[in-house]
Every structure is written in C-alpha cells, then in structure tokens.
C-alpha cells in the first residue's frame, strides 16, 4: 500500500529575475519535514517549480501525493492540461512560442509518472499556515545567501 503524503510548496524571488528561494513541507502521519533551497539567479516561476521538484525527489518510494501550491503557473499547467498540450506541440505554446522552463517541466513529468500526484491551488499569503511556512522557508533561503 502506497504512503499518502501531503506536500506544500512555495517559491520566492528577490527581483524577478533575481536571487530566489524555495520551501516545502512534506507531511506523513504525524511527521513533518521541512526542506528549502536557494538559487543566485532565477525567476519566481523557476522557484515554484523547483519547490515541487525537490519535494517529490525527496520521496524514496512511489507515493500518493496531494501537492498544494499557490502557483497558478504550476497547478494550471497540470490541471488545465497545458503541460500535455506543450509536450504534444513539441514544447510550443498555443502562440507557437517556446515554453519557458522546459528543463524543470521535464523533471516534473518524470516525477509525476513515479507518484500518484494530485495538484491543488491554495491562496497565497493568506491564512494557510502551511503555505505561509513554505513562504518563510523560501524567503529565509534567500536571506541566508545574501
């Protein structure tokens, strides 16, 4: 039986592009693990995607994952079928432009094949303590690398 994991993720950028950080919470039963990271030159969208990638890469076996993010870019790409269309169109948008962050999207595609992942949109910077904690982790990662 696969483990059921709840994941919250967030990314932040000081300037866009600029220095960036990401944070994630992984919850299984009564256990919570916090992870975070930093990039010296990035964008907010790359940090949002990186948070999801790093969280999913942390899992050591296939799991049932409910991933919560305040990133419409991440959640809509999965739930609205953008990612499927991009891959079907050889990584081109509906406007025939190259999709940004292809390297990260390819990693996400690989990871969501390993796990049973459901993506959920949460409101950012509101009263969700888990999302707020991920935001703190992401901002702290930037601050720690100034």
Swiss-Prot record:
Keywords: Cytoplasm, Endonuclease, Hydrolase, Magnesium, Metal-binding, Nuclease. Its EC number is 3.1.26.4. SUPFAM superfamilies: Ribonuclease H-like. GO terms for cellular component: cytoplasm. GO terms for molecular function: magnesium ion binding; nucleic acid binding; RNA-DNA hybrid ribonuclease activity. It is an enzyme of class 3 (hydrolase). Its main location: cytoplasm. Mg(2+) 1 binds at residues 10, 48, 70. NCBIfam families: PRK00203.1 (NF001236). This is Ribonuclease H. It comes from Chlorobium phaeobacteroides (strain DSM 266 / SMG 266 / 2430).
């Amino acid at each position: 039986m696969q483990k059921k994991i709840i994941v919250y993720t967030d990314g932040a950028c000081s300037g866009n592009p600029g220095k960036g950080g990401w944070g994630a919470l992984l919850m299984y039963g009564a256990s919570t693990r916090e992870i975070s990271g930093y990039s010296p030159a990035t964008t907010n969208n790359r940090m949002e995607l990186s948070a999801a990638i790093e969280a999913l890469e942390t899992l050591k076996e296939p799991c049932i994952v409910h991933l919560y993010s305040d990133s419409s870019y991440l959640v809509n790409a999965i739930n609205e079928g953008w990612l499927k269309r991009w891959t079907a169109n050889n990584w081109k948008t509906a406007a025939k432009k190259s999709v940004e962050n292809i390297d990260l999207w390819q990693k996400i595609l690989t990871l969501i094949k390993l796990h049973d992942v459901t993506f959920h949109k949460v409101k950012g910077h509101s009263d969700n303590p888990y999302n707020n904690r991920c935001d703190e982790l992401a901002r702290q990662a930037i601050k720690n690398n100034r």
